[in-house]
A protein has these predicted regions:
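A ligand-binding cleft/hinge motif common to bilobed small-molecule-binding domains
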Residues: 106-116, 182-184, 211-245, 322
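Stable alpha-helical elements in mature extracytoplasmic
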Residues: 52, 56, 60, 64, ...
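N-terminal (or domain-start) structured segment
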Residues: 32-123, 162-164, 186-213, 222, ...
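N-terminal secretory signal peptides that target proteins for export/translocation
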Residues: 1-11
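An extracytoplasmic/periplasmic, membrane-proximal ligand-sensing/linker region
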Residues: 38-40, 184, 224, 247-250, ...
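Hinge/capping helix and adjacent helix->loop/strand transition within the periplasmic-binding protein
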Residues: 91-97, 104, 112-199, 248, ...
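Bacterial N-terminal signal peptides
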Residues: 13-29
Length: 333
């Protein structure tokens, strides 16, 4: 359990770089920053079109295009679990015209699992700001005799064999959330990986696997219909979409905080004044009601803030997941 909170060498560097950029923003003017942008900005989404990451990107890109006076063009560049598109931004010119839709999987998990990721989240990127975060919901099939996290833990400890739980694949947040729960509570769980959320949900609804961590939009209808039973939210605070559902921390697992965090990042070396401008326009977009509502349909809550606040969240996620990935020996070649 201590491995999840173990200090990792160089862990403060990412935060230090972010803080330095904020300080510099107030002290220096960079050539070309005053009239930035003078041409379209490319926002790379490192996943195929159609997913929640693309929706997040388009929601903020439309608003930012209007306030920046130049188009923010969303370009999907998927492959290798998001590492191909992310790596391309790391190698892009640090001029503010190529930025990244960053995500928990690509910033905090993939580099720990994939020796060939080709980028270092701390060295190669500087944060612009967070877009929002989306919790998962711990759900069980109604046939499982557990109506709370405490009852689930008691059931799992008494079970003769590890309780199975599904996920859309090895190394996903859904997978690691289960491993994290097992590590924190001492219960034995058996991970059953699927090729995507669809097949996993099919087996969960059919009672072939008893539990799973699922996104809020997936959980909502099923929990309300009674086809699945929601036990807890994975984030530190409750969700406005399921306000009666307690958090795992409230349910006897102190400190449990697992979220999908979405944000914007730029290549390291991007002028601080450009970062400040992008942060300002991102926050303005997130303050609008229509963007908030669109994010809510994806199960996410808008969270405007500073670059250093986003850096701190990414750093905390990286510490948590890299420690767990190392402990479990998970690797993707």
């Amino acid at each position: 359990m201590s491995g999840l909170r173990r200090s990792i060498p160089g862990a403060d560097r990412f935060l230090s770089v972010a803080f330095a950029f904020i300080v510099l923003c107030g002290s220096f003017d960079f050539a070309g920053a005053d009239d930035y942008p003078t041409r379209p900005i490319t926002l790379i989404v490192p996943f195929p079109p159609g997913g929640s990451t693309t929706v997040m990107a388009r929601n903020v890109a439309d608003k930012m295009s209007a306030t920046l006076g130049q188009p923010v063009v969303v370009e999907n560049r998927g492959g290798a679990g998001g590492t191909i598109g992310t790596r391309s931004v790391a190698k892009a010119a640090p001029d503010g015209y190529t930025i990244l839709l960053s995500y928990t999987a690509t910033m905090a998990i993939a580099p720990s699992m994939n020796v060939n990721a080709g980028y270092d989240p701390r060295k190669d990127f500087v944060p612009i700001g967070m877009i929002g975060f989306a919790p998962n919901v711990l759900v069980v099939h109604p046939s499982l005799p557990a109506r709370s996290v405490a009852e689930l833990i008691a059931y799992a400890k008494a079970a003769p064999a590890p309780v199975q739980y599904g996920s859309p694949g090895v190394g996903t947040v859904n997978h690691l959330a289960g491993e994290y729960l097992a590590s924190e509570t001492g219960v034995k769980l058996q991970h059953v990986p699927y090729k995507g959320n669809g097949p996993a949900m099919g087996d969960l609804l059919g009672g072939h696997i008893p539990m799973m961590f699922v996104p809020i939009p997936v959980a909502l209808g099923n929990v309300k219909a009674g086809t699945l039973r929601g036990l807890a939210i994975t984030t530190a605070k409750r969700s406005g979409l399921l306000p009666d559902l307690p958090t795992l921390a409230e349910s006897g697992v102190p400190g449990f905080d697992v979220a999908l965090r979405y944000g914007l990042m730029a290549p390291t070396g991007t002028p601080p004044a450009v970062i400040a401008r992008l942060n300002r326009e991102l926050n303005a977009a997130l303050a609008t009601e229509d963007v908030k509502q669109r994010l809510a349909t994806e199960g996410a809550e808008a969270l405007p803030g500073t670059p250093e606040a986003y850096a701190a969240d990414v750093d905390a996620d990286e510490k948590r997941w890299s420690g767990l990935v190392k402990k479990l020996g998970i690797k993707v070649e």
